[in-house]
From Swiss-Prot:
The gene is cysS. GO terms for cellular component: cytosol. Its cofactor is Zn(2+). Belongs to the class-I aminoacyl-tRNA synthetase family. This is Cysteine--tRNA ligase. It comes from Rhodopseudomonas palustris (strain HaA2). Keywords: Aminoacyl-tRNA synthetase, ATP-binding, Cytoplasm, Ligase, Metal-binding, Nucleotide-binding, Protein biosynthesis, Zinc.
Length: 493
């Protein structure tokens, strides 16, 4: 099957035809390096890693250029640096924060089994390209200078009689709708509420560079111009695929399109726009205010979730088993289920080597808009048919190769009984809980769950149920002889 990908701009699945098959070019928005990456950040990293692998398979390992940027200039970085290193000059503190956070990010995504991108540019290394694009936009009448800022005018873009796309096309919004929905407290130097910043003056002590457009005061770039500059430098004026999370469609990606197309007078910045769906935690949007903000590092290195640290491959599996455009509800139960699948696969494979050729049906699944969930269903059939060499080849292709670590962490409710090839990796051969609880401790949790159910606090009830499940305790709700609700429990087998 030829590769077909869903394009956010056209809202349809289309045959993928690279501009230059000898150099397929993809850009994905990367992290702003001011704090540990959270599990929502992990999803696009993993999704586009699988796409990178597929493109390399289809077009050749040396014929794909994957660019994922590092944003190392941002207000959040400045705030973090000032808070963490109050005794240092701000620029030095910023350097410490960005270098440390970038290392942490790389450690985390390496643990998730992701390949490094071909190029990983930093925003601060591309200030010259940003100034060049801004000067072009001002000269073309698409941007203007006001109060030492440079601002882009979507109205000017839409008024241009040229090949340019309509501002708002990617997000499927009209300019009138955006103006009506703009906040009341619009900066006084803006001509229109929808105008956005390309460049702004720096405050004393902040990072600063010589400004474009004849501005004498030094300043720093806005967020959106950074990606336009880095993609242009490494991929050209127009390239094949631009990816990121669905939350970036507007305003970030919409503004990237505006900047790049107006600067280079093209009708498209990228031939295909791809966006992965939202991630929720236990049914709610993840946020620090709700107390459900989970970092990749917490899952990999602490026992906060499920009573033990998690292997990166397990998180990877939980992220890809759902189609990339669908939302994900992250739960400890989902990690347990993914762990059980990988554990079963690795256990059955034993010391079998991978097949030399990937099954065609497996590649066909992935070529259908990166349908990894369908590919996983096919992998289950390989296990059922005892085609373990083919199963291992498909696992390796999707980034799963750490059998020892996966097998060393026993899934909830599973007896350890491994073939000799992996016996040394196992933690034991007895049926015990991952984190043993006393009978009274279990019953205390069940009583707390019963009380939560009585007051209709089902979120808390489900949380306790999932916590017990993660510890190997299966609970069952029923009624006693008098018809009253009762909950029983047993150690899962």
């Amino acid at each position: 099957m030829a590769l077909r990908l869903y394009d956010t701009l056209t809202k349809e699945k289309r045959a993928f035809a690279p501009i230059d098959p000898s150099n397929v070019r993809m850009y994905v928005c990367g992290p702003t390096v001011y704090d540990f990456a959270h599990i929502g950040n992990a999803r696009p990293v993993i999704v586009f890693d699988v796409l990178f692998r597929l493109l390399r398979h289809l077009y050749g390992e040396n014929h794909v250029t994957y660019v994922r940027n590092i944003t190392d200039v941002d207000d959040k970085i400045n705030d973090r640096a000032a808070r963490d290193y109050p005794g240092l000059p701000l620029n030095e503190a910023i350097r410490k924060v960005t270098e440390q956070t970038e290392r942490q990010f790389h450690d985390d995504v390496d643990a998730l089994g992701c390949l490094r991108p071909t190029v990983e540019p930093r925003a601060t290394e591309h200030i010259g390209e940003m100034r060049t694009i801004i000067d072009r936009l001002v000269a073309g009448g698409f941007a203007y200078v006001a109060a030492d800022h440079v601002l882009f005018s979507p109205a000017a873009m839409n008024a241009a009689n040229s090949v340019l796309p309509r501002y708002g096309a990617l997000a499927n919004r009209s300019l009138d709708e955006m103006i009506a929905g703009a906040r009341v407290d619009v900066a006084p130097y803006k001509r229109d509420a929808t105008d956005f910043v390309l460049w702004k003056p720096s405050k004393p002590g902040e990072p600063s560079w010589p400004s474009p457009a004849g501005i004498t005061m030094e300043g720093r770039p806005g967020w959106h111009i950074e990606c336009s500059a880095m993609s242009w430098k490494h991929l050209g004026e127009t390239f094949d695929i631009h990816g990121g999370g669905i939350d970036l469609v507007f305003p970030h990606h919409e503004n990237e399109v505006a900047q790049s197309c107006c600067a280079f007078q093209t009708d498209r910045m990228a031939q295909t726009w791809m966006h992965n769906g939202f991630l929720q935690v236990e049914g709610e949007k993840m946020s620090k205010s709700l107390g459900n903000f989970i970092t990749i590092r917490e899952l990999l290195a602490t026992e906060k979730f499920g009573g033990d640290s998690w292997v990166g491959e397990i998180l990877r599996f939980a992220m890809i088993k759902t189609h990339y455009r669908s939302p994900i509800d992250w739960t400890v139960k989902a990690l347990d289920e993914g762990h059980k699948v990988l554990w079963d696969w690795y256990r059955d494979i034993g010391d079998v080597g991978p097949a030399q050729q990937l099954p065609g049906e497996f590649i066909d699944c992935l070529a259908d808009d990166l349908n990894i969930s369908s590919a996983i269903a096919f992998m289950h059939s390989l296990r059922k048919d005892k085609k373990f060499a083919e199963l291992l080849a498909t696992m390796n292709f999707l980034g799963f190769s750490n059998a020892e670590s996966v097998l060393a962490r026993r899934p909830v409710g599973v007896r350890i009984n491994l073939p000799p090839a992996h016996a040394e990796a196992a933690v034991g051969t007895v049926e015990v809980l991952a984190k043993p609880l006393s009978k009274s401790e279990i019953e205390e949790r069940i009583d707390a769950r019963t009380a939560a159910r009585a007051r209709k606090d089902f979120k808390e009830s489900d949380r306790i149920r999932d916590e017990l499940a993660a510890m190997g305790i299966a609970i069952k709700d029923g009624k006693d002889a008098d018809g009253k609700p009762v909950t029983t429990w047993e150690i899962a087998r």
